[in-house]
Curated annotation (Swiss-Prot):
GO terms for molecular function: 5'-3' DNA helicase activity; ATP binding; ATP hydrolysis activity; DNA binding; magnesium ion binding. This is ATP-dependent DNA helicase PIF4. It comes from the Eukaryota. Signal peptide: none annotated. Its cofactor is Mg(2+). It catalyses: Couples ATP hydrolysis with the unwinding of duplex DNA at the replication fork by translocating in the 5'-3' direction. This creates two antiparallel DNA single strands (ssDNA). The leading ssDNA polymer is the template for DNA polymerase III holoenzyme which synthesizes a continuous strand; ATP + H2O = ADP + phosphate + H(+). It comes from Trypanosoma brucei brucei (strain 927/4 GUTat10.1). The lineage of its organism: Eukaryota, Discoba, Euglenozoa, Kinetoplastea, Metakinetoplastina. The keyword Lyase does not apply.
Length: 819
């Protein structure tokens, strides 16, 4: 009933759903690359098939059935013939053929590449060792050869380094959020919308590797931001940008427990543009009934609303944070899997890995520590960062070289401006500035530790600021969790004002409004005094607070800093292996490794800083690392625009000649060059909307690299022997498979403290991965989509009996319009 009625609905507006891509992109796709088109996943008329929500391992019968299906699919892929579509037609240029031969791709990957060059948005799946990373590199090379603007990203730093890109979060400006509680979960959902729209406005293709480690909201937030970027097509998925995703959901996936509840609904979803009505499983069924009852409706608005209700109902019933359960991922990408394994030349080892992938640990794999010889230089893999840190520390104790402690410090950069307005320290704004005066309200009868009173006080003070009624003035009201001698609650009010106002003007207006609203004779004023008690109104200059703020921040967040792998103080020795934790330049990024060969002062090693460095510190910050006082008062020397990289702007280092500001010299593995690693200023986590000033931590972005977490190695092929110690393993699907599949031969693998009960498989991921079509099936589906597109563009009528008509809804992205 639902299938037939929805087909009738979609026939009435199918012509409206097809639209050409950007003209600029079309002009550069003259060699057979078509306009943007979206493709569908699913074999049964485009219906969504949400994966089961169980987290236990699959049963033996289901595993055997899926295993047989996988074997059959791969055999079909190896024997299937070409389909005559896209760039596989006779009109394919000789330039493309020469490009294919130069890339050294096998037949399967060449056919996948033709789909990409034909404009298909793709998800490329496949097991470990099939060459997904090399496939991504080949795709990027071919697209850039056609003068397309391609952005290459990955979910982790090491995976990004492996494909020559950057992390997804750093590329699009998405804040990495630790979501351990409901408050942070809400801010995580909001932050997803903060994508770089300037980048989205000009890019042609976005490539994301290791997509399984991203939350579904990252992909959906990218879609919302791209459709709202300047010059984009709002009604097309991703605004018309071709998106290529790559990954394996049978490897490590995003941790759903930390980012979203099992039902997936609630306020967090509404924050990023979902429907405001709270559709439950019952109301989702009601929405389907509504669609059936309105089958004869021809009004476009009602039709679009009906389709949106279907998609939203599915989303709220199946959302768990996993990308393969997102309707956007299921409906707006053409899916395929690569089957030909390239990494592992050991056939017996490959068979063991395939069984491990499906949840079966063979006896040969269990005895790997006994069968294979011990390698003292083997890379250690652990499940937790704590175990990695302990092993790295033990290796450091074995070294006899010079040792140096790089102690992290907290830096209070200044007062934080209200959301959407310039920071007080940001002088780039033309008509907005921050006041030097700050209003401090001391609620002497309310305790600072009470979250309830913090909310009530901030709400009350915010209402008073609103009643001031001054246009062009924005306020920032915060109750920071600073430690101090006074246990009572303090609220800070800071103003960002237009240039036409004096900074004292809003302070005077607020004081007058405070006197009237709090100390007046009205019933509301009397009620406020009874409710909040004694309050002291005080005005302070921001500079007088800097010392207190820095000390309070360090005390309040010392545990956070020392428990953070990046922000904590580092102890390094000459001769120790290290890994870079942040992007410094195009050559040296998060995940780059090397060996410490010495320590030098800043003034003697500036020529060793990376060229074109992305991040830099001001003179003032480098002076704070020294025990000597600041000599120069030239404010221009502290500009954040100064660079270490030889661009002619070295004033920041010219005025810092302190011998006790030390940096490590690292011989990088990538090119063998000696590089001075600079100090970095990184944001203090969990401070958004909770603090009075912008606070950062100045730290050294290096850690010892004798051991890694399994998560860090996903996407890599290791040439060294590895030792996987499973002691202290936490429940994590696919983690044993990811670790074991990093090497090419069984002789390179040793596993200890492992048992069969540690090998678990996510049923939904197994179901999705086993149902992925091979390249031949993807080609057939893409050809069908192109034929449907031509029919609609030519004004031809589509028959309701056509099973592909329902899939026309997959061209429409209006179900996620941001309101």
């Amino acid at each position: 009933m639902l299938l037939n009625s929805t087909r009738t609905l979609l026939l009435t507006y199918g012509r409206l759903l097809f639209a050409p891509g950007r003209e600029g992109r079309q002009s550069r796709l003259a060699k057979g690359v078509s306009a943007w088109t979206v493709a569908a996943e699913g074999e049964k008329g485009g219906q969504l098939s949400p994966a089961p929500e169980s987290t236990s391992c699959c049963g033996a019968a289901e595993v055997n059935e899926i295993k047989e299906r996988d074997t059959k699919t791969c055999r079909q892929a190896s024997s299937a013939g070409h389909n005559d579509l896209g760039l596989q037609e006779k009109e394919k240029s000789s330039g493309d053929e020469s490009a294919f031969s130069s890339l050294g791709l096998n037949e399967e990957k060449r056919r996948a590449l033709t789909l990409v060059l034909d404009g298909a948005p793709l998800f490329i799946g496949g097991g470990a060792g099939v060459g997904k990373s090399y496939m991504i590199q080949s795709i990027v090379t071919a697209l850039r050869a056609k003068d397309l603007d391609v952005v290459v990203t990955a979910s982790t730093g090491i995976a990004a380094l492996n494909i020559g890109g950057s992390t997804f979060h750093s590329t699009f400006g998405v804040r990495v959020t630790s979501v351990g509680n409901s408050e942070t979960n809400e801010s995580c959902a909001v932050s997803i919308l903060r994508y770089s729209k300037s980048l989205l406005a000009k890019v042609d293709v976005i490539v994301v590797d290791e997509v399984s480690l991203l939350h579904a909201r990252h992909l959906e937030g990218l879609d919302i931001a791209a459709r709202g970027a300047p010059g984009r097509i709002p009604h097309l998925p991703f605004g018309g940008i071709q998106v290529i995703l790559c990954g394996d959901f049978m490897q490590l996936m995003h941790s759903t427990e930390n980012c979203t509840s099992q039902d997936g609904g609630g306020d967090a979803g509404n924050k990023i543009g979902y429907r405001g009505d709270e559709t439950t499983e019952n109301t989702a069924g009601q929405n389907r009934s509504d669609v059936s009852s309105t089958a004869a409706v021809t009004d476009q608005g009602h039709i679009m609303s009906a389709v949106k209700n279907i998609c939203v109902g599915e989303r709220q019933r199946t959302s768990s944070g996993l990308i393969f359960e997102s309707p956007l991922f299921l409906t707006c990408l053409l899916h395929l899997q690569l089957c030909e394994v390239k990494r592992h030349g050991d056939t017996a080892f490959l068979n063991d890995l395939n069984k491990l992938r499906q949840g079966v640990l063979t006896r040969r794999m269990m005895r790997s520590a006994l069968v294979n010889p011990e390698d003292p230089n083997a890379i250690q893999l652990y499940p937790t960062r704590r175990s990695v840190a302990a092993f790295n520390e033990s290796k450091m104790l074995e070294l006899d070289g010079e040792e140096h402690l790089f102690r992290s410090i907290v830096e209070s950069a200044g007062l934080s401006g209200p959301k959407g307005h310039a920071s007080p320290n940001s002088r780039g704004a033309n008509n907005v500035d921050g006041c030097n005066d700050v209003v401090v309200l001391h609620f002497l009868e309310k305790m600072r530790s009470s979250r309830r009173w913090q909310r009530e006080v901030k709400k009350f003070v915010g209402q008073i600021c609103t009643r001031c009624g001054i246009s062009g003035i924005a306020t920032s009201v915060v109750a920071p969790p600073y430690s101090s001698r006074q246990p009572y609650l303090k609220v800070y009010v800071h103003f960002c004002v237009s240039k036409q106002y004096d900074c004292l003007y809003p302070v005077a207006k607020m004081k007058a409004e405070w006197e009237r609203s709090y100390y007046g004779t009205t019933p509301e004023s009397k009620s406020a005094r009874r409710f909040f008690g004694r309050v002291l109104f005080e005005v302070k200059h921001k500079n007088s607070l800097s010392t207190f703020l820095r000390a309070s921040l360090k005390q309040a967040y010392s545990k956070v800093i020392e428990s953070d792998n990046v922000l904590q103080s580092k102890r390094l020795k000459v001769g120790c292996r290290v890994i870079l934790l942040r992007n410094l330049s195009n050559e040296y990024v998060n995940g780059s490794t090397g060996t410490v060969i010495g320590f030098q002062p800043v003034n003697k090693s500036r020529h060793l800083f990376p060229k074109g460095i992305r991040t830099q510190l001001s003179r003032k910050v480098y002076a704070s690392l020294s025990r000597r006082p600041v000599v120069s008062s030239d404010s221009s020397a502290g500009s954040s625009e100064n660079s270490y990289g030889g661009n002619g702007k070295e004033q920041a280092l010219d005025v810092v000649n302190y011998d006790d500001v030390i940096v490590p010299i690292v011989r990088m593995d990538a090119d063998g060059k000696d590089v001075a690693i600079p100090w970095l200023s990184l944001p203090l986590p969990d401070l958004q909307d909770r603090v009075f000033c912008t606070a950062r931590v100045v730290t050294m972005p290096l850690v010892p690299a004798y051991a890694f977490t399994v998560h860090k190695t996903q996407g890599l092929t290791l040439d060294h022997s590895i030792l996987l110690d499973c002691k202290g393993f936490f429940p994590c699907n696919h983690i044993i498979y990811v670790a074991a599949s990093r090497v090419k031969k069984f002789s390179q693998l040793r596993m200890i403290n492992v048992s069969p009960r540690m090998v678990t498989v996510h049923p939904g991921a197994l179901h999705f991965s086993s149902s992925l079509p091979n390249v031949a099936e993807a080609e057939t589906k893409w050809k069908k989509w192109k034929e449907l597109q031509r029919m609609v563009n030519n004004g031809k009528a589509l028959s309701a009996s056509n099973p592909s008509v329902l899939e026309l809804a997959l061209y429409c992205a209006t179900w996620k319009h941001h309101k």
